[in-house]
Amino acid sequence: MSGEETSADRNVEIWKIKKLIKSLEMARGNGTSMISLIIPPKDQISRVSKMLADEFGTASNIKSRVNRLSVLGAITSVQHRLKLYTKVPPNGLVIYCGTIVTEEGKEKKVNIDFEPFKPINTSLYLCDNKFHTEALTALLADDNKFGFIVMDGNGALFGTLQGNTREVLHKFTVDLPKKHGRGGQSALRFARLRMEKRHNYVRKVAEVATQLFITNDKPNIAGLILAGSADFKTELSQSDMFDPRLQSKVIKLVDVSYGGENGFNQAIELAAESLQNVKFIQEKKLIGRYFDEISQDTGKYCFGVEDTLRALELGSVETLICWENLDIQRYVLKNHANSTSTTVLHLTPEQEKDKSHFTDKESGVEMELIESQPLLEWLANNYKMFGATLEIITDKSQEGSQFVRGFGGIGGILRYKVDFQSMQLDELDNDGFDLDDY
């Protein structure tokens, strides 16, 4: 993934994978004709192709004719998918192929291949009556990457923690003069020299932090922990030299008894609880910002499907907020009474039961269904076209559940004020509605 992709884009990718895992886990097939294949980044396509050719030979000996044919068919499908790639993508490759049995009892072929959003270091080939998604689930478990700066009087260490993987990015030592009681008339001069050395040390730490933790003008970490003994970490967090983009990412200041690697390990232990709550805190902040716009009545907000989609089309949505379980379907219908027009509807499960939505009001002719998909899925695929960022939230925090219950689980923070009421009136006027008649 390129460094330009923001954490919001990454969250959308994660949501797509979660959705995919859910549908794959529910799928079941007859016999062992469902193939799960995961190829790690450094592997060779040629090795996997040879392994599949060997498997094809082995599968030809399966006694049950039906099972044999479906396994051979699945292996052939995987081979065709592999031919689309000249080499394994940077993050590895995941392929699921096979024949599943739908709820109606019909057989349906499934062919899925994609590159995960971060490197997958698992090699897997399995034929079974279900798809194996454990490796994908593990990929989602510990996604956020956190930065650590450990400072003490002897030097500084910069590291990252992602899941269970800790990495030291850089460290340097420093020789700071100690406090002392001698010096006579020079005592003030000594104190000033000491303060200057401290100041230069803090400045160097701030500069190195910017080099390591900022890529393409954006922080490449989800949060930052400042650790150390004495007062250095507080000095750094309040310093003007510390990059404001990183300042906003500081989650916690922790006191550690050591510097260097031991201090890094201690800081990870002490900050563990805060790191678990980061997603939760980010969500609270985002919805808090949305509620602030409403309470201050700035007009720079929208909620509900209609207003939000209208604002999206205007290009005025800066941040689009959606609940992860938004239960609204998007239908594209073709009207045969008026052959050129297509209608887009957004319906809840309750509204779907009312068949009048699918008939033309004037002619009473039933409209043809061209496509149907969950609205959130459509937004996840198209939000970039409207210049918005998409934030997918849960209802686990108090603010999240308030947003879902009170605002229907969809809304947005706008770049500028939009008057939705006058837009609705304009649309009615355009439909031949004359206010003078009333």
From Swiss-Prot:
Directs the termination of nascent peptide synthesis (translation) in response to the termination codons UAA, UAG and UGA. GO terms for biological process: cytoplasmic translational termination; translational termination. Belongs to the eukaryotic release factor 1 family. SMART domains: eRF1_1. It is found in: Cytoplasm. Keywords: Cytoplasm, Phosphoprotein, Protein biosynthesis. This is Eukaryotic peptide chain release factor subunit 1. The modification Phosphoserine is found at S341. It comes from Drosophila melanogaster (Fruit fly). The gene is eRF1. Its main location: cytoplasm. Gene3D superfamilies: 3.30.1330.30, eRF1 domain 1 (3.30.960.10), eRF1 domain 2 (3.30.420.60). One of its GO terms (cellular component) is translation release factor complex. Heterodimer of two subunits, one of which binds GTP. GO terms for molecular function: sequence-specific mRNA binding; translation release factor activity, codon specific.
